[in-house]
A protein has these predicted regions:
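Boundary at the C-terminal end of the N-terminal hydrophobic targeting segment
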Residues: 19-22
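Acidic-aromatic substrate-binding/catalytic surfaces of carbohydrate-active enzymes
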Residues: 50-111
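A contiguous, surface-exposed recognition patch within enzymatic or periplasmic domains that forms
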Residues: 51, 58-60, 65-72, 78-79, ...
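Short peripheral tails and domain-boundary helices/loops at the edges of structured domains
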Residues: 303-313
Length: 313
């Protein structure tokens, strides 16, 4: 869940932000507020900037040298994330919300530039540079929890400006537009723009079977704190803070799905609450990722919902 807390900056961060006084940053477990996590994390450095985080037959690869992106997430060596070579079409990234504050392209310091790297208490910690434009720093913490077989990702947004700001966290994960199914707990009638994408209702949730169109499409929805994606071999489930309809940033939403034109890629997006930050304050927001083998038919079913609910309980 999102927590508002005072900022403490490590010496490594100080090298990147000249005018900030060095302070000790709290431990990752203290930041997340989940010190009861049972970690079984194996972190391996693959090259100068890439790190593998392993737990059992699951492996996640993160590139600290290029925006701290998640490049890969596999179960039993089967990939779930888009591996497209084109810019802005692969991996999983993190932005600040609302988008209208920066429009396009994504803020380079968060999405493209190198992050510093630390490893502490079985957690891989990445710190971005401060954005020249927005004056935020992004911190990403990657760990695993063997209690529920999840990858625990905690994002922090740090206000290094001299003024009070309002901001929300935003995770964007790209998957191939192939034979996939996206579903979440929200009424079809509440998905906006109404009728833009072919959502159907079954078993009390909304379902979208990946399709193709000549234009880009994006919807907003007020979900119940989870978002799932099913393909022919895998089930990806994300669990995050459930928001009320008034919690998101202006013109944003708890759950968003973006489908790029043609049969290229789809973005699974979730956001946290729009939060006021005083100078040198930060917010933290945690997303748990679950990836399971699943060769059941790619279609809406009671069994699939039961599997998701068992995972996120």
């Amino acid at each position: 869940m999102m927590q508002l807390k005072p900022l403490f900056i490590s010496l490594m961060c100080l090298v990147q932000a000249h005018a900030v006084q060095a302070r000790e940053y709290p431990s990752p477990s203290a930041l997340r507020g989940d010190a009861d996590i049972q970690k079984e994390t194996l972190i391996k450095q693959l090259d100068d900037s890439k790190y593998a985080i392993e737990m059992g037959d699951l492996i996640m690869v993160v590139d600290a040298g290029h925006g701290g992106k998640i490049l890969s997430f596999k179960c039993q060596d089967v990939e779930v994330i888009s591996q497209s070579p084109m810019r802005e079409t692969f991996g999983s990234t993190f932005w600040t919300s609302p988008q209208k504050e920066w429009n396009w392209p994504p803020v380079q310091e968060y999405d493209k530039m190198p992050y510093s790297v630390e490893e502490e208490e079985g957690t891989l910690i990445l710190n971005s540079q401060v954005s020249d434009r927005l004056k935020y720093r992004i911190r990403k913490e990657f760990a695993t929890d063997k209690k529920d077989n999840s990858f625990v990702i905690t994002y922090s947004i740090i206000n290094e400006s001299g003024v009070v700001r309002r901001v929300a966290p935003w995770e964007i994960t790209r998957v191939p537009n192939e034979d996939g199914l996206i579903f979440f707990d929200a009424p079809v009638a509440g998905i906006t723009p109404v009728g833009l994408m072919a959502f159907t209702s079954a078993e009390g949730v909304s379902w979208y079977r990946a399709d193709a169109a000549d234009s880009n499409r994006k919807i907003n929805a007020d979900g119940k704190g989870w978002l799932a994606y099913k393909n022919q071999h895998l089930l990806l489930v994300k669990k995050f803070q459930d928001l009320t309809p008034t919690d998101p940033a202006p013109d944003e939403a708890e759950i968003q799905v973006y489908v790029n034109r043609g049969k290229t890629y789809i973005e699974l997006e979730s956001q946290g609450a729009y939060t006021e930050l005083k100078p040198m304050e930060s917010l933290s927001w945690t997303v748990r990722w679950y990836l399971l083998p699943d060769s059941s038919p790619v279609e809406a079913s009671k069994q699939l919902i039961q599997k998701v609910k068992k995972v996120i309980k």
